[in-house]
Amino acid sequence: MISEKEELLEWRKRAAAQPKGRVVLDLEADSLHRYQEKICLIQYADETGSCLIDPLAIEDMSPFYNWLRDTEVWMHGADYDMCLFQRAWETLPAMIWDTQTAARLLGFRQFGLAALVEHFHGVTLSKSSQKADWARRPLSPTMVTYALN
């Protein structure tokens, strides 16, 4: 888990080297547990692997949001995450490819991430930590596993 600015700077170098359109992002927030929600965890994946970024532990997230505004990303159900990005850092990705929107346009009746992953890959995703309090630290092993999957 990336929880220090120096680690974030190293991550940014690696992320900047990835081909456009080959980056996946997801966010976890604490909207079910706090009145003014905030981004509690950033899940990042590319062709070389995945990692978790802890924005609650890193005071200066500018390496992330500066990278974000020049990046094409894949997300699922990106509308809420875009609101969080805009509210937290007043920025958005350069381009967003939303798999939920694509599934709806293609006529899928079940367009949730779990349904699509099962349909295309035969893998059942756990929803065990979907409603967890992502602002609590340390994250439990179950939450970390959920976030990386």
Residue ranges and their predicted role:
Residues 103, 120, 134-135:
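Residue-level signal for alpha-helical context at structural boundaries
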